[in-house]
């Protein structure tokens, strides 16, 4: 009981401190979490383009310029036909990436990568979904190739693919343009 009381006391203390700081700087912070900039608006429109054209778009640039904020705004504005995931160095592998995507789409997890990709494809085929992957520079080559395949039309059903947007630093673009360009196409 004492341990729980200590944890609750600490929790409420931290909440009070956060509220006090927010009150002090409240006038300095924007009221809206999204402030449109030319870059964030370009990101927003590029995601829409990928969705409408069922293609892959790669958006890259320096950190802090508005790429992620534009993507977050799009995902908030289109909750039924857009899904976003963020990749980290530990989730850039094919297995981790498709597991994260399956969770975001509420597709049951499968035992192996092939079955998981088939389940994802079945869920996505014929929809106007767009997948937004932030921090895409962490994707390994196999994950990039599988994600790219989601834009392809399904040869078995004829259903069109979906839009995919990769957002990251310039490394993601360099990797696609570099020695793997011939393989990736």
Name every feature range the model reports, one short phrase each.
Residues 1-54:
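A short, basic N-terminal segment
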Residues 25, 93-100, 107-150, 154-165:
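Mid-core helix/loop region of P-loop NTP-binding domains shared across ATPases and GTPases
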Residues 52-73, 89-90:
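Walker A/P-loop nucleotide-binding motif
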Residues 56-64, 139, 151-181:
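Sensor-1/coupling segment of RecA-like P-loop NTPase cores
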Residues 56-60, 84, 132:
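Short hydrophobic/aromatic beta-strand immediately N-terminal to the Walker A/P-loop
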Residues 78-90:
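Conserved catalytic segments around the Walker B and adjacent sensor/switch elements
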Residues 80, 178-185:
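A short helix-turn-beta junction within AAA+ P-loop NTPase domains corresponding to the substrate/partner-engaging
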